UniProtKB/Swiss-Prot annotation:
Main location as per UniProt: membrane
Key words of the record: Cell membrane, Membrane, Transmembrane, Transmembrane helix
Name assigned to this protein: UPF0154 protein Exig_1099
Family affiliation: Belongs to the UPF0154 family.
Entry's Gene Ontology cellular component terms: plasma membrane
Organism encoding this protein: Exiguobacterium sibiricum (strain DSM 17290 / CCUG 55495 / CIP 109462 / JCM 13490 / 255-15)
Subcellular localization(s) per the UniProt record: Cell membrane
Ranges for region Disordered: 54-76
InterPro entries on file: UPF0154 (IPR005359)
Pfam families noted in UniProt: UPF0154 (PF03672)
Membrane-protein topology: Single-pass membrane protein
Residue ranges crossing the lipid bilayer per the database entry: 4-24
Amino acid sequence: MATWIWILIALLCLVAGVALGFYIARRYMMNYLEQNPPINEDMIKTLMMQMGQKPSQKKVNQVMRSMSGSMKSPKK
């Protein structure tokens, strides 16, 4: 076969692999986020009420700030 056909086949396989990889990664992330939703303020308020604390907005904001800060800090 001609060289250009092999190049065309290789490019088509590369494009198909990238598209398939993107689809699989997207589907995995959607499934992961569905099973493990990110924490929001309502979840923190519910958690505080279950622990017997009165969830004030100041406390909720403090917990949200500390959680976002801990996620941004580098792991050692």
